[in-house]
Every structure is written in C-alpha cells, then in structure tokens.
UniProtKB/Swiss-Prot annotation:
<dbReference type="InterPro" id="IPR006171">
    <property type="entry name" value="TOPRIM_dom"/>
</dbReference>
<feature type="domain" description="Toprim">
    <location>
        <begin position="256"/>
        <end position="349"/>
    </location>
</feature>
<dbReference type="GO" id="GO:0005737">
    <property type="term" value="C:cytoplasm"/>
</dbReference>
<keyword id="KW-0548">Nucleotidyltransferase</keyword>
<keyword id="KW-0804">Transcription</keyword>
<dbReference type="GO" id="GO:0000428">
    <property type="term" value="C:DNA-directed RNA polymerase complex"/>
</dbReference>
<feature type="binding site">
    <location>
        <position position="262"/>
    </location>
    <ligand>
        <name>Mg(2+) 1</name>
    </ligand>
</feature>
<feature type="binding site">
    <location>
        <position position="307"/>
    </location>
    <ligand>
        <name>Mg(2+) 1</name>
    </ligand>
</feature>
<dbReference type="InterPro" id="IPR034151">
    <property type="entry name" value="TOPRIM_DnaG_bac"/>
</dbReference>
<dbReference type="Pfam" id="PF13155">
    <property type="entry name" value="Toprim_2"/>
</dbReference>
<comment type="similarity">
    <text>Belongs to the DnaG primase family.</text>
</comment>
<keyword id="KW-0479">Metal-binding</keyword>
<dbReference type="Pfam" id="PF01807">
    <property type="entry name" value="Zn_ribbon_DnaG"/>
</dbReference>
<feature type="zinc finger region" description="CHC2-type">
    <location>
        <begin position="40"/>
        <end position="64"/>
    </location>
</feature>
<dbReference type="GO" id="GO:0003899">
    <property type="term" value="F:DNA-directed RNA polymerase activity"/>
</dbReference>
<keyword id="KW-0863">Zinc-finger</keyword>
<dbReference type="InterPro" id="IPR037068">
    <property type="entry name" value="DNA_primase_core_N_sf"/>
</dbReference>
Length: 606
C-alpha cells in the first residue's frame, strides 16, 4: 500500500486531540465563556479576534479569516505538510496509523533517529571535547557568538575515521546511519567509516526544529571539498528545504516577507544581528518546492540579498525563472562590492541591513539591468544576445498573465513591441536586423514560430497517472516529479496538484502537452491497483534513464583521466558521484520492482 492515511484514522486524531491544549502551546489563550480567545498568530493585531471553539473542534479569526481544525493549525503554524501534521499529532496521541506500517515510513523513522543521534554527537564534540577547540576558534572568527552557535545547533565532526561510527555501533544503529548517509561502507566491504570528518557541522532542520541533514565546513585538513552536504534521503529533499526556516518562521509570518541568501553562515550572521526572517538555499537552485515552503510560512514577498559583483548578478538571472514561474513578488538588494551578507551584517548591524533591504528594487529591474544595461540605447545585436540569455528564464514561466506581463516589461526596456519580443523569444532563429533602424520588422509575412516540441511519452504517462489519481504522488518516493524534463508537463503537474484538478490542468496546457497527456490517459488502466503498478513502473523507467544518462556523462568526462594520483578535485567528485548513482540505481530497481502479478505499464514509450 502507498502512504495514504485512512480517513477514519484522521478522524480519530481530530476527535482525540485537545485543540485548546495544542494551540495554547503557541498562543496565549484566555477563557471567554465556552470559547477561548487570543491575538491571532497569523496576522498582527492588538485586540483579540482569534477564537478556539473546543466543542466544535475548530478555530476562527474574525480579522484575517483564518480557520480550521487541529491538523490545519499544525500545517499553518508549524509549516508542515498535511501528512506530516497528521503523523505528528497521531504520534503524540498514540494513534496507530496504518500507513506507519509501510516500509518506507519505518525507514524514514530510522533515519530521523539516526540524524538526532548524529546532531547530539557533533554538538558534544564541539562543546565538551578538547578536539573541538579549533572548530570553536573558527566559529568565533566568523563572528558567530556561542549563543547563536547553540541556537542553531552547530557541532564538530573530528578528523577520526570512526568517531560517529563507533557511537552508532554501540547503539546498534549502523544500518540506520548508513541509510541516512552519515556513515559509508568501506571499499573492502568490512565495516563503516564516518562521512563527515574534520568539519564544523551545521544542522539543516525541518520547520519544526528537528535535524534532517547536515552541512559541513572543512577545517584544518586539506583533503576533500571545502563544503560537504548530506546526501538526500527519505527525510531530506534539498529542493524542498530552506536552511534556517525553523528559526525564521515566526518572523516571516509576522513580516509576511523572507530574506533569501545563498550560504548557511550568511543566514547565521543575519540572525545574529536581529534580521530573523532570513533563510538560505541548501546548495541548490530555487525550486517550486521552496516556494511552497515559503507560501506555508505566509511569505508574500521574497527579498534576495546578494553579492554586488558579477556572481550576484548571475544569481539574479538564475533565480528569476523559478520566482517568475511562481508569480512571486520579489525584490533584489545588492551588497557593496567585496561584501557578503555575513560580513556586511557584522559591520553595519541590523540597522544597516534593514536599510539595504528597504531600498531593494523589483526583481525584473535588476534582471533587465544585468542582461541589457544600455536598455533602449543598446544595439540590435546586444538586444538579441540579451534575449538569448532570457530564453531559459521565460521557458520556466507558464503561458498566462505573468508571462504576458513579462513580455511587456521586456518590450519597454528594449524599446520594442511585446509581440516582437514574444516572437523573438519563441524562435530559435534570430530576427533579421532591419535596414533602417533598431526595431525588428513587423511584416505580417514573418514566418510563424516553430511548433512546440512534443513532450516525452513516458513523462506524459507519469503526469496522466497523477491526474487520474493525485494520491499517487505519495508513492513517488524518489521525487521523479523533479526529473521531468518538459516544462509544460511540470507546469501541468503543478497546476493539478495545487488543487485545480485535471480539467483545469489540461485547459491551461499547450496543445502539444494536452495531446500527450490525453493519449496517456486513454491508455492508462482505470482500476486503482493496476494504475498504481503502472505508475511505479513509469517512475522506475524515468529514474533509471536519468541515472544512466548521468553515468554516461561521467564515464566520458573521466575516461581520459591520467593515473589515480593525478586526479583533479572535479574528477574525484565525479567518481564519488558515480558510486552514489550506482547505489541509487540499485535502490530504484529493488524498491520499484514490478508487482508479482505481472502488471506492467500500459506501454513502454521511447
């Protein structure tokens, strides 16, 4: 069975939970007749308008209209998903969820416990052992106080090969630690060794504060990458995790805004001076998953705090696609040359940072300034080059109002017409330069843009299966949804899973995407069991293909490598990645094995 919690179990949780007790942990409730009242935790107010009605098991705010039951309160206040909110409440109440018997859920719990043990081990190594002296000195040199270091749970992984391994061996948890990526099997196959060594450890926490992964900064050793992060697991998906969200959630909700930086220590430095609505990416680009996390924290605006050099401008370009695709309100604050958020915060303090944030400019203004500094005065060739760089950004924005507005803004900056901008961006062939001026020709005989490339059939089957049965997404334990290569399919999937349904998803899609999905829907089985079997087979095939493509690339990139002692750092990392990919492929083939009944996908698309 998939990870689907039976309805009667959810109802049991709602009936048994003490709603007043639950909410009073986070809100100062006062008795008011049969009800309880307080100032609303979801918006700022001076006069209480938030009421809890225990008899009816719901809460309601007369001010912002927030309302719901115990599960929705945990979701909204703690930033949890629906499934996690139900699980946490059930665990507290002792309700045995049938879904908890699923092997994937047992593994998730084992990884949680192993990660908790590792966090405690690293913390003790930093503060209670002489070995942690160099790490404490490094942390102090970064301007991080002991108080901040303790609040964020910083730790130390010593240089020894088996410091953490021995702890897990004594606890009988080595297998769990291996699943969490905290220890690795020796090449000889005999025993394990620590994944993190000689590193200042920064726990990456879920919104409720529990560690789910780690980032490690190399100290006092010259072997290995400067920064090393936990691999992804059933517990940790870097595309859906923002560092510091556990510390910043309340401030984000209060301000309705979040500050985004790209480094853990940047976020630490901002929090230390009082800018407590800052979060950081976990060594990945911004994704739709991150936007959902921010949405659950009620961030209506995102401010990018970036270096003022070429790297910062490149980051604006890189982050624009996901932000525009999500229709987010975003602004950009660029730091003075030579500063990063951490050093600037230490020198200027909260007041200086807040002043910089207040002066942040709209995202598109910075994007256009980066792509085409001269604006309308730029040459035709410069404008076409800027449009080429803009194509990947526009490709992430779905057809609709946001995309049309983007075309208009580009046209204004370029001094062109919106229709000409759209035609140039859709066409792979640059528009011809006009003889008499900078504006591109507007002849009605201009060739129509090429037809959209048809989406891959296998990916159409994946999206079609989810449209038929949205709960199948819970069976996507390998995050195949993140591997979809066709943006139109990704947008259709996002539209459907955000509550709009299959019909709306198809209505909003292009003709090519619509045809592909409709063809898949006709061929997919209708019955739940065969449909689930087909879905798992599709997931398996997509994952294996993606892994094989990457393995081929790594083979080509490393086959010309000289002797083992002459390996570059890049080659070493590729070889490590190859080992991890082979292990992942083995897991995929084992865990997504076709059902014994012989049920297969409706077809094997190429």
């Amino acid at each position: 069975m998939g990870v689907v919690i039976p309805e009667h179990k959810i109802q049991e949780v709602l009936e048994r939970v003490d709603l007043v007790g639950l909410i009073s942990r986070h809100v100062d409730l006062k008795k008011a007749g049969r009800e309880w009242k307080a100032c609303c935790p979801f918006h700022q107010e001076k006069t209480p308008s938030f009421y809890v009605v225990p008899e009816k098991r719901f809460y309601f705010c007369h001010g912002c209209r927030a309302s719901g039951d115990a599960v929705s309160f945990v979701q909204r206040y703690l930033g949890k998903t629906f499934l996690d909110a139900v699980r946490d409440l059930a665990r507290e109440l002792g309700v045995d969820l049938e879904a908890e018997q699923d092997p994937s859920m047992r593994e998730r719990q084992q990884i949680k416990e192993a990660t908790d043990q590792a966090a405690e081990h690293f913390r003790a190594m930093l503060w209670q052992q002489d070995e942690g002296r160099s790490a404490r000195a490094y942390i102090a040199s970064r301007g991080v106080s002991d108080e901040t270091a303790m609040a964020f749970g910083l730790g130390w992984a010593p240089l020894e090969w088996a410091s953490l391994t021995e702890r897990f061996q004594k606890l009988g948890m080595l297998e769990w630690a291996a699943k969490a990526g905290l220890v690795l099997k020796r090449n000889s196959g005999d025993g394990y060794y620590d994944f993190f060594r000689s590193r200042v450890m920064v726990p990456i926490r879920a919104p409720e504060g529990r560690p789910i992964a780690f980032g490690g900064r190399l100290i006092g050793a010259d072997e290995g990458p400067k920064y090393l992060n936990s691999r992804e697991s059933r517990l940790y998906n870097k595309s859906e995790t923002l560092f510091g969200m556990d510390q910043s959630r309340d401030e984000i909700r209060k301000r309705k805004a979040a500050v985004l930086v790209e480094g853990y220590f940047d976020a630490l430095g901002l929090h230390q001076v009082g800018v407590r609505h800052a979060v950081a990416l976990c060594s990945t680009n911004l994704t739709a998953g991150h936007m959902q996390v921010l949405k659950r924290a009620e961030a209506r605006e995102l401010i990018l705090l970036l270096d003022g050099d070429s790297a910062g401008l490149a980051a604006v370009e890189r982050l624009s696609g996901p932000l525009l695709a999500a229709g987010a309100t975003a602004r950009v604050a660029l730091l003075p040359q030579g500063d990063d958020p951490d050093t600037f915060a230490r020198r200027e303090g909260q007041e200086g940072v807040e002043r910089l944030l207040e002066g942040a400019h709209p995202l598109t203004s910075h994007l256009f300034a980066s792509l085409l500094p001269e604006g309308k005065a730029a040459s035709f060739e410069e404008k076409m080059a800027a449009l080429e760089r803009l194509k990947p950004v526009v490709g992430q924005v779905p057809v609709g109002l946001v995309r049309a507005t983007l075309f208009s803004a580009v046209a204004e900056h370029f001094g062109w017409r919106p229709a000409d901008v759209e035609a140039a961006l859709r066409s792979k062939v640059p528009l011809p330069k006009p003889a008499g001026g900078d504006a591109p020709p507007s002849s009605p005989n201009r060739p129509a843009p090429p037809l959209e490339k048809p989406p891959p059939a296998l990916e159409c089957f994946y999206v079609g299966a989810v449209l038929k049965e949205p709960r199948l997404m819970a069976r996507d334990t390998f995050r195949v949804c993140d591997e979809l290569s066709h943006m139109g399919l990704r947008m259709a999937l996002a539209h459907a899973t955000s509550g709009h349904g299959a019909n709306d998803a198809l209505f909003e899609s292009s003709e090519a995407v619509k045809r592909g999905i409709e063809s898949a829907l006709r061929q997919l089985p209708s019955e739940p069991v065969p449909l689930e079997a087909a879905f798992l087979s599709i997931c398996r095939e997509i994952m294996v293909r993606r892994i094989d493509e990457r393995l081929v690339y790594i083979k080509r990139a490393t086959e010309q490598t000289p002797g083992a002692f002459d390996l570059t750092e890049e080659t070493r990392q590729l070889l490590v990645e190859r080992v991890e990919l082979l292990a992942l492929k083995k897991r995929v083939l084992e865990e997504l094995k076709p059902a014994s009944s012989g049920t297969k996908a409706p077809m094997q698309p190429v």
